[in-house]
């Protein structure tokens, strides 16, 4: 599973700065979900090919009241759900009582915890970090998050132990189609899971009991092997009523990153709400293949159905590549049709293509619509090759590729989507510029060229 790293510490110790550096963004993703703190931030990150989720848990000052105490409590929940903890302290402030309190709590969790001394720049390194050894958390890793100093060394240490596990997960994904069922609370995720697993043709292996964590369920349907990742964390049992679902954004993000295909479940009776779009954004950002299911469809009046369809066209136009299903998980209407879309999306997301084929598509696209001029010179796109799958990545080589405008990239995405019949999956375009061996070198003119240049210059002067 993709590991989750929680950034923990007092307010203003640099958690957001480190978060932005790790996720390479200034605009932190704010998860504004019901029942969750408003300022907890989540983002996907990658370091040396290893993917992970970063959580900025918000500051814990120790004297919270009212809403602050709720936010602190939810920060503790995020810490408890994470796999690795980066505990940030401020070298300029030195060791504080709140730092000691937080350290005391972290020691009780028995999780991999790395003590990170931030803002070490401009200070005597050894003197600045010395007080923090008192916290009893082992080695002190010094960084200057604002400038990026020490961050790569820190992350290499933090992620060293998960390398083998990540490779094993990737190998396992090749053998079995993993699909994650995600959605906000009470849209019918658990009912859909039970319906999908309850079909007569489904053979479930080692059915787990009730748990609040995401559940990985291996099963077989029509001689095809699947792993279903259930983020709702509740199971059907005889004579037991459905329990209240505990929604966890961390578990949802982990499930998205670990899946090949994501099924986003929405409540048709409520239409599309902002929380649905937040989750959809995470799925798109991860690059996973996508299927959208509108649940509770059979209970709607015809007028409301028309309204919902209009809203879908208006608000989900940016994911027009995803199949849309109108289902009733409770009665089973339309549920079986999900598999066809899942298989099609998975096939498109994992297909392999030759360099010659991708280059031919590029050449046709450039012939039909040339890249724009930049400072009087035409951007040249020479050849393309595959750079990865799930999502499909097309790497295009050429000159001045850093100047390719967004609208032209969108054009190429549409061309490749149409040519490769990429149904149900996003496609990503990456550019590479070849190094110019003559960059920075002046041409040395021959004697004959110098004579010609002087003659031309005389002609220009006479005209003036």
Swiss-Prot record:
Entry binding sites for GTP 2: 183-190, 230-234, 295-298
Binding site for GTP 1: 9-16, 56-60, 118-121
Keywords associated with the record: GTP-binding, Nucleotide-binding, Repeat, Ribosome biogenesis
Gene3D superfamilies named in the record: 3.30.300.20, P-loop containing nucleotide triphosphate hydrolases (3.40.50.300)
Domain KH-like positions: 351-435
Family: Belongs to the TRAFAC class TrmE-Era-EngA-EngB-Septin-like GTPase superfamily. EngA (Der) GTPase family.
Gene Ontology MF terms: GTP binding; ribosome binding
Name recorded for this polypeptide: GTPase Der
Chain segments annotated as transmembrane: none
Database matches in Pfam families: KH_dom-like (PF14714), MMR_HSR1 (PF01926)
Function according to Swiss-Prot or TrEMBL: GTPase that plays an essential role in the late steps of ribosome biogenesis.
């Amino acid at each position: 599973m993709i590991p989750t790293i929680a950034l923990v510490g007092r307010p203003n110790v640099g958690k957001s700065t480190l978060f932005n550096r790790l996720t390479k963004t200034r605009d932190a993703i704010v998860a504004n979900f019901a029942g969750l703190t408003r300022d907890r931030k989540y983002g996907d990150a990658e370091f040396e090919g290893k993917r992970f989720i970063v959580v900025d848990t918000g500051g814990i000052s120790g004297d919270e009241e009212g809403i602050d105490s709720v936010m602190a409590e939810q920060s503790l929940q995020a810490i408890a759900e994470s796999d690795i903890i980066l505990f940030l302290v401020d070298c300029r402030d030195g060791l504080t009582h709140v730092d000691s309190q937080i350290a005391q709590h972290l020691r009780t969790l028995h999780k991999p915890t790395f003590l990170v001394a931030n803002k070490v720049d401009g200070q005597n390194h050894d003197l600045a970090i010395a007080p923090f050894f008192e916290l009893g958390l082992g080695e002190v890793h010094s960084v200057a998050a604002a400038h990026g100093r020490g961050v790569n060394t820190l992350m290499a240490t933090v992620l060293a132990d998960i390398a083998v596990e990540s490779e094993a997960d990737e190998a396992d994904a090749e053998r079995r189609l993993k699909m994650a069922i995600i959605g906000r609370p009470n849209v019918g995720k658990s009912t859909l899971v039970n319906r999908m697993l309850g079909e007569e043709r489904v053979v479930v292996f080692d059915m787990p009991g009730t748990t609040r964590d995401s559940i990985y369920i291996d099963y077989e349907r029509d001689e095809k092997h699947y792993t279903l990742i259930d983020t709702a964390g509740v199971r059907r049992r005889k004579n037991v009523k459905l329990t209240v679902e505990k929604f966890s954004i961390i578990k949802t993000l982990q499930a998205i990153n670990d899946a090949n295909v994501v099924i986003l479940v929405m409540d048709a009776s409520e239409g599309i709400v902002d929380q649905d779009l937040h989750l959809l954004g995470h799925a798109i950002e991860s690059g996973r293949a996508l299927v959208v299911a509108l649940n509770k469809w059979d209970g709607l009046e015809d007028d409301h159905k028309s309204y919902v369809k209009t809203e879908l066209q208006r608000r989900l136009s940016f994911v027009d590549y995803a199949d849309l299903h109108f289902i009733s998980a409770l009665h089973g209407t339309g549920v079986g049709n999900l598999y066809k879309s899942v298989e099609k999306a998975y096939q498109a997301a994992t297909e392999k293509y030759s360099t010659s084929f991708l280059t031919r598509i590029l050449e046709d696209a450039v012939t039909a619509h040339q890249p724009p001029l930049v400072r009087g010179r035409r951007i040249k796109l020479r050849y393309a090759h595959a750079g990865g799958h799930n999502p499909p990545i097309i790497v295009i080589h050429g000159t001045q590729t850093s100047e390719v405008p967004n609208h032209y990239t969108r054009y190429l995405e549409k061309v490749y989507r149409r040519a490769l019949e990429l149904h149900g999956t996003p496609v990503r375009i990456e550019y590479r510029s070849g190094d110019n061996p003559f960059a920075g070198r002046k041409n040395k003119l021959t004697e004959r060229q110098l004579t010609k240049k002087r003659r031309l210059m005389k002609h220009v002067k006479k005209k003036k």
